[in-house]
């Protein structure tokens, strides 16, 4: 099945509110297009230092009640840093406790600020040991990494190649820490776009078969003439740019962003109809012994067929996990065609 991560929504696992698990609970009980593919209970930057322990407690307390009904995957972001042993020690403790107490409700963990490949291997070893101590099957917990340091960027290819025989399932770009580590400056209020890095991330993750996720967009709201309004256009521009260069999903900081990114990273009605028309025609041609066929002026052969098939397989994956989203987004006849068409690979 196609691995879905259109949305990577971080939610502080503890905040200074009467209900400190407010945002965690909101993510776990989200519905419709506001449900992320990956929910990331955040123990790291999103949670104040004084509330880290409470953040872990909240995850342990809330997951048994809410995780069974949550449609997406759950991967907490723990503390970690390639250049700080204390952070790695705390992260190890967090992984071990969560795997032991709620491991059956987790799909994996997110490790921030990893360094070179040796540090990635260390993080993978922490997960493997936590699985053993918790009595979980080997490989039950996946690992996602946040690419936000110069050493990790230098070893990007090696890290992605490590994924081919490991539990590594996703790489996420962290532009704020990366810019700071490189000494970058936000001149004129504009941050770097890092197009070269994103294109490399898209290429290397595609070659390794892991998902690539873009960085956060923190300009959530604008204010004008005393009115504050959600910056939907700015976020959509970033997500659409990521989608055009093959980034699989986008970082979300807010349910409104999740709803936008879920839709943008979803084949449009026109894309799906076009893919189905060409798949159906090519299937007929193959049955008649023809290796290629012209459909709507385009030559469709095995290579282009796979591109159209990927569109259909993504829709099927979304429908498997989020049927309310596909039911709202596509008309019934088109969705039925997508679910029933034969997808043939040589």
Feature annotation, model-predicted:
Residues 1-346:
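Expand to "…catalyze enediolate/carbanion chemistry for C-C bond making/breaking, isomerization
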């Amino acid at each position: 099945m196609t691995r879905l991560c259109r949305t990577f929504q971080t939610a502080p696992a503890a905040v200074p509110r009467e209900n400190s698990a407010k945002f965690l609970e909101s993510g776990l009980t989200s519905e419709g297009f506001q449900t992320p593919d990956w929910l990331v209970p955040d123990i790291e930057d999103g949670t104040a230092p004084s509330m880290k322990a409470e953040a872990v407690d909240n995850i342990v307390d809330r997951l048994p009640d809410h995780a069974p009904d949550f449609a997406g995957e759950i991967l907490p972001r723990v503390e970690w840093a390639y250049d700080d042993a204390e952070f790695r020690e705390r992260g190890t403790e967090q992984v071990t406790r969560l795997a032991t107490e709620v491991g059956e409700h987790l799909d994996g963990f997110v490790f921030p600020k990893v360094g070179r490949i040796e540090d990635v291997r260390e993080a993978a070893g922490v997960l493997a040991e936590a699985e053993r101590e918790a009595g979980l099957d080997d490989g039950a917990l996946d690992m996602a990494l946040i690419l936000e340091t110069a050493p990790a960027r230098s070893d990007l290819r090696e890290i992605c190649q490590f994924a081919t025989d490991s539990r590594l399932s996703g790489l996420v770009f962290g532009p704020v820490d990366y810019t700071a580590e490189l000494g970058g400056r936000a001149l004129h209020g504009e941050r770097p776009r890092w197009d070269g890095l994103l294109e490399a991330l898209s290429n290397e993750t595609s070659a390794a078969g892991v998902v690539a996720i873009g960085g956060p967009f923190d300009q959530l709201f604008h204010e004008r003439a005393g009115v504050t309004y959600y910056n939907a256009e700015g976020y959509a521009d970033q997500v659409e740019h990521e989608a055009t260069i093959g980034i699989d999903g986008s970082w979300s900081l807010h349910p409104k962003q999740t709803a936008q990114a879920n839709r943008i990273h979803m084949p449009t009605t026109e894309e799906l109809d076009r893919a189905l028309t060409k798949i159906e025609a090519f299937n007929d041609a193959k049955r008649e012994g023809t290796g290629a066929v012209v459909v709507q002026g385009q030559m469709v052969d095995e290579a282009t067929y796979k591109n159209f098939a990927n569109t259909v397989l993504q829709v099927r994956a979304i429908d498997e996990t989020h049927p309310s989203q596909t039911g709202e987004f596509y008309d019934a006849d088109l969705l039925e065609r997508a679910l029933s068409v034969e997808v043939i690979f040589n």
